[in-house]
């Protein structure tokens, strides 16, 4: 099948690799190179790099909502468009531009976690089950019919990297299966029950509320690493917690109290034992190395 591929981050790479092997990728659309590093060099997206290596034409328009881009897509000889974490809303004119429309890989149990950050919200909310869906896109926000779906059981302390890697590779396999049977698949409409929205994360959400349970804070730490990071402030410095453990211990301390010299912190329920953290503008350190340079005393109440 002749395919136009739209995607940007590492999450989309396994699918593009599979499409290159099994189908004919006619064009790739990805976000424009972004300034990176101290020298502010222009870094191509992972998808741009992969397409370049395989000599596939690459386009990086600033928007899909203009006649120039729509006309370009109409001119590409393709049967279908595959969209994964592209970063732009796809207008109706493009959704309907090809015979089989636009397919999307969405890593959640739709209609739960529609939106921009399903992987992060799955972890932050402590979900122990999820899914990967192949969806035919429509004009709504992740409201399209489901062509194929596979459920996942999640480990209680799964990290964002682990979940992303698992869903990316499963999604690639499911998409290839979908394309092989696309003329025979009966689309399934999404339920109107259980709809939630996985809104894009904000930096403000990363601030830790010590009155939450230790487990809830641990979920936030795992779901927000690397960005925006779950953080607290100490001596007017922002400190991100990169890794921690939660302990279901009863206690009588005010939430936010440091109860040991190993940075164990009382929460609304339970204790959070910090194991890796990073002060703003400094490198990440394990707890022992961090405490050698920043002494957070027992009985300190963190804000």
UniProtKB/Swiss-Prot annotation:
Q: Which residues bind (6S)-5,6,7,8-tetrahydrofolate?
A: 108-111
**Gene3D superfamilies noted in UniProt:** 3.40.50.12230
Its Enzyme Commission number? 2.1.2.9
Q: Which Pfam families match?
A: Formyl_trans_C (PF02911), Formyl_trans_N (PF00551)
| GO MF term set | methionyl-tRNA formyltransferase activity
Q: Would the keyword Cytoplasm be found if you checked this record's keyword annotation?
A: no
Catalytic activity entry: L-methionyl-tRNA(fMet) + (6R)-10-formyltetrahydrofolate = N-formyl-L-methionyl-tRNA(fMet) + (6S)-5,6,7,8-tetrahydrofolate + H(+)
* Enzyme class label: transferase
Its Gene Ontology cellular component terms are: cytosol
Lineage, top-rank taxon, reads Bacteria
Which InterPro entries does the entry mention? Fmt, Formyl_trans_C, Formyl_transf_N, Formyl_transf_N_sf, Formyl_transferase-like_C_sf, Met-tRNA-FMT_C, Met-tRNA-FMT_N
Sorted keywords for this record are: Protein biosynthesis, Transferase
Recorded hits in HAMAP family, A to Z, give: Formyl_trans
Kindly give the PANTHER family that the UniProt entry links to this protein.
METHIONYL-TRNA FORMYLTRANSFERASE (PTHR11138), METHIONYL-TRNA FORMYLTRANSFERASE, MITOCHONDRIAL (PTHR11138:SF5)
* Similarity remark: Belongs to the Fmt family.
**What biological function has been recorded for the protein in this entry?**
Attaches a formyl group to the free amino group of methionyl-tRNA(fMet). The formyl group appears to play a dual role in the initiator identity of N-formylmethionyl-tRNA by promoting its recognition by IF2 and preventing the misappropriation of this tRNA by the elongation apparatus.
What name appears for this protein in its UniProt entry?
Methionyl-tRNA formyltransferase
């Amino acid at each position: 099948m002749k395919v136009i591929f739209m995607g940007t981050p590492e999450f989309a790479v396994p699918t593009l690799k599979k499409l290159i092997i099994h189908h004919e990728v006619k064009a790739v659309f990805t976000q424009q190179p972004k300034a990176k590093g101290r020298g502010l060099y222009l870094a191509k997206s992972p998808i741009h790099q992969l397409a370049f290596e395989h000599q596939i034409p690459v386009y990086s328009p600033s928007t899909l909502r203009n006649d120039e881009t729509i006309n370009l897509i109409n001119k590409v000889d393709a049967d279908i468009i595959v969209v994964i974490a592209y970063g732009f809303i796809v207008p109706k004119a493009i959704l309907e531009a090809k015979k089989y429309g636009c397919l999307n890989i969405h890593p959640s149990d739709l209609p739960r976690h529609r939106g921009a950050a399903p992987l992060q919200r799955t972890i932050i909310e402590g979900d122990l089950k999820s899914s990967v869906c192949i969806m035919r896109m429509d004009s709504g926000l992740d409201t399209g019919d489901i062509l194929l779906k596979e459920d996942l059981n999640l480990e209680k302390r799964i990290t964002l990297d682990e979940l992303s890697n698992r869903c990316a590779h499963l999604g690639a396999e499911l998409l290839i299966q979908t394309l092989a049977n696309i003329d025979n698949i009966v689309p399934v409409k999404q339920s109107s029950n259980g709809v939630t929205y996985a809104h894009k994360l904000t930096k403000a959400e990363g601030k830790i509320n010590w009155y939450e349970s230790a487990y809830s804070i641990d979920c936030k730490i795992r779901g927000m690493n690397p960005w925006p990071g779950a953080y607290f402030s100490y001596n007017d410095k922002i400190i991100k917690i990169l890794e921690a453990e939660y302990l279901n211990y009863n206690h009588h301390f005010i939430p936010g109290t440091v109860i040991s010299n190993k940075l164990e912190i009382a929460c609304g329920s339970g204790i959070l034992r910090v194991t890796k953290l990073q002060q703003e503008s400094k490198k990440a350190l394990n707890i022992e190395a961090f405490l050698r340079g920043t002494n957070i005393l027992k009985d300190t109440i963190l804000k």
